[in-house]
Amino acid sequence: MNSYLLAFKSGFGFLSTIPVGITMEGIDELMKKIFFYPVVGAVLGLLIGIVAYAGQLVFPGPVLAALIMGFVYYITGFNHLDGVTDMGDGFMAHGSLEKKVKALKDTTLGTGGVAFGILVLLAFYGSIRSVQEEGIAAFGSNLPFLMFASMFIAEVSAKQSMLTIAAFGKPLPRLKEQTYPGLGEMTINGATRKNFLIGFIFGAVVCCLPFGLIGLIPYLAACISALVLLNRSYAHFGGLNGDGIGTANEIGRITALIVIAVTLKLSLNGYLGGLEWTLL
């Protein structure tokens, strides 16, 4: 199989629950061509967006928000959310850097992890509902399209957030008994400046398709959220691992949706100047 096709296919095996099959050879190719992260995000975003569009025609807002969340985790899995809970345990641990790293890598779930997981899920739900509520006034009968485009942009932004935090991060030191790199370290090593730039440009272009330049606002905000998370990971752990990269995915998605909702509100109040919403 062509190396690019293998990397693209492996992206779905690595970033989603779609049963395409995945091998170590495929993972190696994906890490060499990690710019496929936002490409895979675009495909997943289309699927999620279609569900959001159809659901907006049928279900009440709160029900649809819950259904969208369910479909997102059905198609992407809970691995990234597991990273959120691990990061929460590490953030809440007291003591030295070593103790924090130990809590981060501990397989048991603590209070900090539970709290962080709940907060992220609540924020995800709230961000979807905010887009719905603010979008009614701005888009009216075109609200289903807004939901489609918002979920599409959010998923592309989530995957680019993973690429962003990996591109600017450095891996945590390996454990003494670990002789091979983990998936987090492999991701960081693969996120070269060239791969980051290719992925970033692709993501920026596709996020502009539904809304014009306004589509860049949530995309850039998600990337910035990844850098903020990286700063906190350095402060608490002295580096970055796969849990931090997975957390960037969840935070990036939520950040994009929140910024879309805020942008809608500001545009309705006339605070966006010459920027106008455009429909694909």
UniProtKB/Swiss-Prot annotation:
Molecular-function GO term, any one: cobalamin 5'-phosphate synthase activity
Function: Joins adenosylcobinamide-GDP and alpha-ribazole to generate adenosylcobalamin (Ado-cobalamin). Also synthesizes adenosylcobalamin 5'-phosphate from adenosylcobinamide-GDP and alpha-ribazole 5'-phosphate.
Keyword terms: Cell membrane, Cobalamin biosynthesis, Magnesium, Membrane, Transferase, Transmembrane, Transmembrane helix
Catalyzed reactions per annotation: alpha-ribazole + adenosylcob(III)inamide-GDP = adenosylcob(III)alamin + GMP + H(+); alpha-ribazole 5'-phosphate + adenosylcob(III)inamide-GDP = adenosylcob(III)alamin 5'-phosphate + GMP + H(+)
Keyword Transferase assigned: yes
Assigned EC number: 2.7.8.26
InterPro entries attached to this UniProt entry: CobS
Cellular component, GO, one term: plasma membrane
HAMAP family linked: CobS (MF_00719)
Its membrane topology: Multi-pass membrane protein
Listed pathway(s): Cofactor biosynthesis; adenosylcobalamin biosynthesis; adenosylcobalamin from cob(II)yrinate a,c-diamide: step 7/7
Cofactor: Mg(2+)
Primary residence: membrane
A GO BP annotation: cobalamin biosynthetic process
Compartment(s): Cell membrane
Spans through the membrane: 4-24, 34-54, 58-78, 108-128, 136-156, 197-217, 254-274
UniProt KW Transmembrane keyword: yes
Protein name: Adenosylcobinamide-GDP ribazoletransferase
Family assignment from sequence similarity: Belongs to the CobS family.
